[in-house]
Amino acid sequence: MRNSKKRLAIFASGRGSNGEALYKAMQDGYINGEFVVIITDHGDAGIVERSKSWNIPLIVIDRSDYDSKASFEQAQLDALEPYKVDGIVLAGYMRIVGTKLIERYEHKILNIHPALLPSFPGLHGHQQAIDGGVKITGCTVHFVDAGMDTGPIIMQNTVPVLPDDTEDTLSDRLLPIEHKTYKESLRLFCEDKLTIKGRVVYIED
């Protein structure tokens, strides 16, 4: 018998393709969770239009509306509180998550990064891989900590880097692998099959 569904918030800044893939996997019953609120820092982000048919509350919390980082982070916490979320999914969220949020939801915030961490953290992971001359790159789903893409790694998958790759072609090749990897990682999280010991995430499946 499955446990009750995990209540999840999704944070997104962009087009929301990973978020949509996760939402569909929940609707199909693959992931034992449900998005109960969407938070974006851009009112014109793609996720706003993409999620209209989901019938999920969407809240815009724009950093420019707050006079300090602390008040911005508090607004995020205040927005989440009524929804009693069990976890937060970052899907193309382009801001560093604040300390308050990390402390409140320790080991409950998941992120996907378009490179094989710990290599190529930060922005432009695809281009960093091309510039670095690596022959294989991939994506990493990890728990979020206070560093830049430094949290414990849940799962990774790979794709080849081709000699004529551009940032766009590599991004297009990696995207379906990102969807697959994030869906599987979130499934495990929602079924309480991830255990963290130090820097290592152990999977029970």
Tell me what each language-model feature is.
Residues G33-Q74:
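Short, surface-exposed acidic-centric catalytic microdomains
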Residues S13, R63, P114:
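Short, conserved catalytic or interaction motifs in soluble domains
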